[in-house]
């Protein structure tokens, strides 16, 4: 064996040892694709209680109209203590809750701290939060017309509805949810589109809510067709969690409609590997096959995914279903959600771990939204240790400090011109 091979093998063994802890931890992380049998059993129980059929289950309109919104029905499906039942009713008077039959089937009924349960079912902690701010992003002050939110020079949001298939307990717009579903009228949306048409610097439009995909196909198509007619709008993004909470929404008809209005992007919101199931995988693949790029915007949530192994597993599983991890958001300080908050140090520790320990494709950007509409602020661990006049000291993903030459760029155009002279 030559020296190069010996060193290479030693290095390979060293690298292999660095992944042992994740391989062991991964075995303990619940993943939806590996829980198909248990999910199906719960599905059958839910169908029996709701008097539904397999055909009903696969129909998103049935899923939406049969969201579970009362404690009595919920307690027939998952185990709830007497106190939990009382708390859910009490919280529901202030902060609405509803959960699609599909998403409910993902909950382990016996696990009081099941991550899917924490994401979707109210807890009394929501009422113990003394924070007063329901709009920490200051969105009410960034609404120049219609149902627009504008915080950046060349892009904006159209909030088309307050409806969702499931109301996340950490929702940043819970102030808009109320107790009744309400899509924005054509007049309000038209006002928003007219504003975009009149402001030629707008090139990127995000259609969201609520959940944009709770709108029917024809209403969504009208919005997309209007935006497509505006020359300076380069592309449209749709914000939706239905891929996670109601994947039946992604029909062949819907995908064929989107094809007419490319480039269309979809940003979705997986927070835990348990949410990646056979059904959500099929929904993502349908969209990807229809030419729709998919990006995931996770939120760092205490007790759900503020763990380096869980986040690594989530991002790697997302790539397998053709969803690019795009952002990890620091949770926002919205009233009733304080128990989900983690420290920025937690986020930086996760980002530090991901770098080098998984491929760049599986590493999203860690984002903190500055309060009062300050916008997205990306955060990274510090890899630049120091800087001299002609060098930098870098910290590698393994923590090694290495010196690298760093000189100013030459004037390449001047150099080429000088060399070309006779």
Curated annotation (Swiss-Prot):
Gene3D superfamilies: 6.10.140.1170, Aldolase class I (3.20.20.70)
Modified sites of kind N6-(pyridoxal phosphate)lysine: 376
PROSITE patterns: RADICAL_SAM
SUPFAM superfamilies cross-referenced by the UniProt entry: Radical SAM enzymes
Cofactor: pyridoxal 5'-phosphate; [4Fe-4S] cluster
Claim: Iron is one of the keywords in the record: yes
Annotated keywords: 4Fe-4S, Iron, Iron-sulfur, Isomerase, Metal-binding, Pyridoxal phosphate, S-adenosyl-L-methionine
Domain Radical SAM core, first and last residues per copy: 150-371
Main enzyme class: isomerase
Function: Catalyzes the interconversion of L-glutamate and L-beta-glutamate. Does not have L-lysine 2,3-aminomutase activity.
NCBIfam families: Glu_2_3_NH3_mut, KamA family radical SAM protein
Protein name per UniProt: Glutamate 2,3-aminomutase
The species this protein was found in: Clostridioides difficile (strain 630)
């Amino acid at each position: 064996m030559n020296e190069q091979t010996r060193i290479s093998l030693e290095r390979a063994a060293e690298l292999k040892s660095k992944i042992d802890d994740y391989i062991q931890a991964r075995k303990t992380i619940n993943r939806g694709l590996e829980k198909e049998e248990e999910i199906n059993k719960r599905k059958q129980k839910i169908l029996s209680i709701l008097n539904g059929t397999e055909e009903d289950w696969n129909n998103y309109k049935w899923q939406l109209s049969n969201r579970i919104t009362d404690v009595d029905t919920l307690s027939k499906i998952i185990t709830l203590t007497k106190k939990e039942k009382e708390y859910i009713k009490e919280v529901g008077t202030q902060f609405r809750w509803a959960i699609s039959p599909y998403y409910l089937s993902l909950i382990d009924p016996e696990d009081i701290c099941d991550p899917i349960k924490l994401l979707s079912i109210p807890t009394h902690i929501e009422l113990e939060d003394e924070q007063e701010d329901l709009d920490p992003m200051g969105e009410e002050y960034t609404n120049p017309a219609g149902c627009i939110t504008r915080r950046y020079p060349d892009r904006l949001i159209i909030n088309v509805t307050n409806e969702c298939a499931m109301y996340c307990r950490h929702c940043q717009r819970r102030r808009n949810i109320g107790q009744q579903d309400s899509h924005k009228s054509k007049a309000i949306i038209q006002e928003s589109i007219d504003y975009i048409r009149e402001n030629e610097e707008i090139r990127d439009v995000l259609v969201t809510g609520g959940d944009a995909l709770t709108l029917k196909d024809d209403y969504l198509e009208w919005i997309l067709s209007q935006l497509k007619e505006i020359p300076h709008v380069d592309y449209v993004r749709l914000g939706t969690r239905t891929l996670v909470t109601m994947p039946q929404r992604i029909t062949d008809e819907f995908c064929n409609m989107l094809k007419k209005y490319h480039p269309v992007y979809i940003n979705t919101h997986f927070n835990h590997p348990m949410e990646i199931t056979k059904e959500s995988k099929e929904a993502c693949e349908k969209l990807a096959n229809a030419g729709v790029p998919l990006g995931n915007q996770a939120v760092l949530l205490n007790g759900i995914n503020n763990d380096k192994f869980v986040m690594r597993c989530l991002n790697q599983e997302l790539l397998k279903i053709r969803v690019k991890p795009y952002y990890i958001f620091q949770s926002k300080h919205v009233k009733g959600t304080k128990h989900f908050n983690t420290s920025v140090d937690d986020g930086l520790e996760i980002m530090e771990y991901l770098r080098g320990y998984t491929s760049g494709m599986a590493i999203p950007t860690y984002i903190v939204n500055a309060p009062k509409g300050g916008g997205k602020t990306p955060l990274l661990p510090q890899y630049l240790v120091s800087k001299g006049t002609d060098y930098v000291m870098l910290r590698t993903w393994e923590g090694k400090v290495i010196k690298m030459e760093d000189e100013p760029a030459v004037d390449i155009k001047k150099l080429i011109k000088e060399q070309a002279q006779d």
